[in-house]
Structures are given as C-alpha cells and as structure tokens.
C-alpha cells in the first residue's frame, strides 16, 4: 500500500464537499461504530533522523504537531487542491499539491497508517472501508501527537521486499539497526515506507531519486541544512548484500 497522491487528492475533494455540509462528523460517527477497533500508539520510539525522514515523506512540513481533520480544515485543503489543478504544468501542479497537503500536516501518512490498521483488522475491500477510514483518520489527527504517529509508522510501516517496521527494514537493507543509520541511509529508509514498486538493489537510480526528494523536504522542514542535504545526496546508498531470498533483477 502506497502513499497514493491521486486517490488522496480525490478523497479530499469529495470530503471537502461533504465537509461543506457538515457531514464529516456524521460519517466519522458511523465509521467509529463500524470499526472493529482504533489504532493504539506504538510503545517504541523511532530514531530522530528516521522520524524526520518519515515526516518529510508524509509531507508534514515544519509543523510540530498534527492538525485535526474536520470540515473546516478539509474544506481549506480541498480549495487549495482545486486551485492547484488549474496549473497546466505538471511539475508546478505537483509542487502546489504538496503545499496543499501540508495544510493538514502528514495527512498522507495518517491515511496510510489508517489503511494499514484496517487491513490488519480485516476491514478491507468491503462496504465499511470509506466510513472506517474517515473515522480512523479523524481520530488519529485529533488525538495523537506527532511523535506517536511517527513511532507507529516506524513500527508498523511496510517497506519494499516485505519488511515490516523501520528497524527490520534497516537491518535488511543496511545490515544495522535504524538507530545506527547516518543521514543518507535514514533518508533512504524513510523514503521507502509505503512503497512496493522499488527494489533498491535492482533500481538504485529510482531509490536515489526517492532519497533526494526526502532530503530536499527535510531541508525545507529545517531538519537539516543545505550542506548536509548535498553531502547525503552525493553519498552511496550504502546497501548491504541483498537477502538470500532476493529474486534476480530483471534485465
């Protein structure tokens, strides 16, 4: 399951219309009644650099806390996305959408964690999904802290080649724990959460591009400076040997 920009933008636009009629609280209530459970925060803490990389991946911006998803914040973001769609330039449009997402910090990451939780509870591909997802996103955004979100993403996030959790993925990719990673590897790790199409051993250029995007966002978030960003971007990926069950790369 990926951080799906197109699906999320469409959902925000639809929710914005619903929010304009103050339907979001009702939808959230229905979803809460249909949900088997709500996620609980992780008890282990994500290392600082990895957490900043995941925050950048989820478009948290410079915010230090989450912003509640409610009819007013949804309507504001929906208006922003509608304005962004007016641009004829794809790159400019994508950049504007990124800025719109920051109006509700890390809403992509919140939506992703909600989806991971729903699938773990067996609520997937059935009629309850839209209601439960709205309820879960609303609950997480209004009651969790930034730290709780990052800790839970690091613990439960899915990474390429079937790794679950940032520490497991770090040991698989780099041969050491997430706490031991330097900036280049922490940024690469954070950039791959929620990805399924990137094999860093087979697609090093694509992996490096993902890392650069996260490094640029970390710089924009003031988590790192220009010099650190450039040095990390020039660094090798730092991968260890692929796991024994790794399939050969296609030609």
Q: Which residue stretches match the model-derived regions?
A:
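N-terminal type II signal-anchor transmembrane helix
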Residues: 1-53, 224, 231, 242-243, ...
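Short loop/turn and capping residues at structural boundaries
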Residues: 150, 229-230
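C-terminal capping/extension segments of zinc metalloprotease domains
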Residues: 214, 235, 240-244
């Amino acid at each position: 399951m990926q951080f799906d920009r197109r699906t999320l933008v469409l959902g925000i636009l639809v929710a914005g219309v619903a929010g304009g009629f103050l339907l979001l609280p009702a939808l959230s209530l229905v979803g809460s009644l249909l949900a088997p459970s709500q996620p609980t925060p992780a008890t282990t803490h994500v290392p600082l650099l990895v957490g900043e990389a995941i925050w950048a991946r989820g478009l948290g911006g410079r915010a230090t806390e989450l912003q509640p998803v409610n009819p007013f914040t949804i309507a504001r973001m929906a208006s922003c996305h509608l304005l962004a769609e007016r641009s004829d330039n794809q790159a400019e449009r994508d950049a504007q959408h990124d800025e719109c997402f920051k109006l509700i910090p890390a809403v992509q990451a919140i939506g992703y964690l909600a989806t991971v939780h729903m699938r773990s509870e067996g609520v997937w591909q059935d009629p309850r999904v839209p209601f439960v997802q709205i309820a879960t996103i609303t609950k997480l955004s209004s009651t969790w802290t930034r730290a709780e979100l990052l800790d839970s993403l690091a613990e439960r996030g899915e990474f390429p080649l079937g790794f679950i959790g940032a520490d497991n993925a770090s040991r698989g990719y780099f041969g050491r724990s997430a706490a031991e990673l330097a900036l280049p590897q922490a940024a690469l790790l954070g950039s791959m959460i929620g990805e399924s199409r990137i094999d860093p051993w087979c697609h090093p250029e694509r992996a490096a591009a993902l890392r650069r995007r996260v490094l640029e966002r970390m710089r924009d978030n003031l988590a790192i400076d220009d010099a650190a960003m450039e040095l990390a971007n020039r660094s090798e990926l730092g991968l260890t040997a692929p796991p024994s069950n790794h399939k050969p790369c296609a030609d």
